[in-house]
Amino acid sequence: MTIQEYKQQLYDACKEHIFLAQQALDRYSTAKTDREREYAKIDNLQHLAAHNALQWALYKASELERRNEQ
């Protein structure tokens, strides 16, 4: 796998987690019980955390790519 392919996979995963975080936020806003809201909030936070970790990995992969080009 090339670094470009790896970066594309990271980017795709970032997009997926943002989509899932938004879905959780939508579930939170339409929740009828405190328990539903709490689960939606937890899901949202987990997807945002995953997105942030993937963004960091994407940044590091880009850094590595730049170093290899020099």
Q: What spans do the regions from the language model cover?
A:
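Short, charge/polar-rich alpha-helical segments
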Residues: 1-18
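Short, charge-rich amphipathic interface segments used for partner binding and complex assembly
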Residues: 13-19, 23-69
